[in-house]
């Protein structure tokens, strides 16, 4: 995971501060939350988060996640914990995430949360 983030940084896809913050995110998710960040799904989620942070910094907008899908995810008993974790992770970064990115970030984090619970 660290290699991938460093490659994104070296290629200019993400800034150094975002790379450093993402290393912190990976550490928190792996050691404190026991989420499978080193899986294919985890790699995709971390890459997307880093890219979303850069898009937000650059003022680039994407289409938001479908509201119906987000509403369906929000019905989960785990949703509040996922939202709280999401907010904690974003505190690592000195930027405001574009609201269009929020749904995707939450969905990816939810997916990791559910994958971890399936493994138990």
From Swiss-Prot:
GO BP terms: regulation of DNA-templated transcription
Disulfide-bonded cysteines: none
Residues passing through the membrane, by range: none
Signal sequence coordinates: none
InterPro entries named in the record: PRD (IPR011608), PRD_sf (IPR036634)
Highest taxon of the lineage: Bacteria
Organism annotation: Escherichia coli (strain K12)
Gene name of the encoded protein: yhfY
PRD domain ranges (all copies): 13-119
Protein name as catalogued: Uncharacterized protein YhfY
């Amino acid at each position: 995971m660290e290699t991938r983030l460093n490659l994104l940084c070296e290629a200019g896809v993400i800034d150094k501060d975002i790379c450093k913050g993402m290393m912190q995110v990976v550490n928190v998710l792996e050691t404190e939350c026991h989420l499978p960040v080193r899986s294919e799904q985890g790699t995709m989620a971390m890459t997307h988060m880093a890219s979303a942070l850069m898009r937000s910094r650059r003022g680039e907008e994407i289409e938001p996640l479908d509201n119906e899908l987000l509403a369906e995810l929000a019905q989960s008993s785990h949703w509040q914990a996922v939202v709280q974790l999401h907010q904690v992770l974003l505190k690592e970064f000195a930027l405001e995430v574009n609201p269009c990115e929020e749904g995707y970030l939450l969905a990816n984090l939810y997916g990791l949360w559910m994958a971890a619970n399936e493994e138990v």
